[in-house]
Amino acid sequence: MSVRQLFACLAVVALTGCAAFNQPSELEKKNVSELTTHMRTWALGRGLIDLPANWSGGGDVKLYYGLGADHSSVAVRVLGEGVTQERFDAALNERAHRIAAVKNDEMNDIPMLVSARRETPQSVMLQYYMRMTQRQTFVHELHLLVEDVYVMLRADSFKGNIAPVEARLLELSTEIFKVTAPQNAGAGFALGPIVIRSHHDQEIASFYFRPPASDVALNVYINALSPDEKERLHVRTQKDTQIFLAGDYENLRAGPITLADMQAEESLIGFSDDTHRQILFVSENYRDNPSLNRPAMGFRLSAGGKKRSAIDPSKPKDLVRWTLPSFASRGYERPLWQLPEPTEPVNPSLTDYEAMAVWDAILKSVRIRYGAVAPKPDPWFNPRGPTPEEAAESKRILDEFIASFEARKP
């Protein structure tokens, strides 16, 4: 056998071995089928996304009115679904009491809570000091019960300029509606079970999704008007992995893809230390004309590392603790000796093949909803029409004009 024939045989053996190694097992195929066959559609800002049926998630968005230095903003977050009026009232009562219990030691120990005002049976406005200070800087929260969805709107005011901030919150509260079918959300920014039909200028949002009691997590970042990154994803990946991983990682896949009908890139890597392995998949889109229906989108799927504990389905979701201002959350803190032992890091619960198959199914499902962005209203448009007096006057003028032509006929 010649040397050329020997190398040819070795190449065939190597390729055959690689192909066999990369073939998914029957168990992997079964797992992928279970994860991707019956997926649930979620509303995702101006778009839609399909995720494995047992995943849950949430998110928040910040809306900007105006793009200059004098812009204002409102943060919107869904605190709970399936919330009754009784739970809504109880949560608000606890929240107000916890904030009021803290004293502003810069203002002669007056309560941090300035006011709590019920606007309607389903909405309450809270105002409290942003921090312990003599300055007139406040946080304003409008808590809403939109059918059975608990929504919190939050904005800040400075130098005692309170009225326009509260007016903005009250106006926005009339522009939030519950959505039962994400596909039918219509125009507006969708945040889980609600759609926000506000005429704002910019929106920045983050979403998270994960399976129950798992090490797997998907995070999505949306910025409507953000320009594209100057350096493409593959360039930043090489730099970041060199800095944080000393270049010691597995490049599972990388390259251009399409995301929501826009150009995009993906970078899929795996890395290990002495205790466990992790995988990190990242994708981002690129567009020349940023707009509300062509937002910058970043996706990040991770697996391995920390495994989250299971949620007790019989225990109602805490509607207060996680969104309290930091100065009012002390009652929830536990001493170090009462904290649970840190859990050992785990390897990914998905194989590379399973993770890549789920990743592909998720990214291919991302699409912008038809009619998700409504035209902005003309500020000079008057929709009310003429008053009866104005209509009568217009008719009189028209009649006189027609009569003048009749009089000229020979």
Language-model-detected regions and their locations in the chain:
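Signature of long, low-cysteine stretches enriched in small and polar/charged residues
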Residues: 97-144, 217-310
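N-terminal export/ancillary region detector
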Residues: 52, 67, 138-140, 154-157, ...
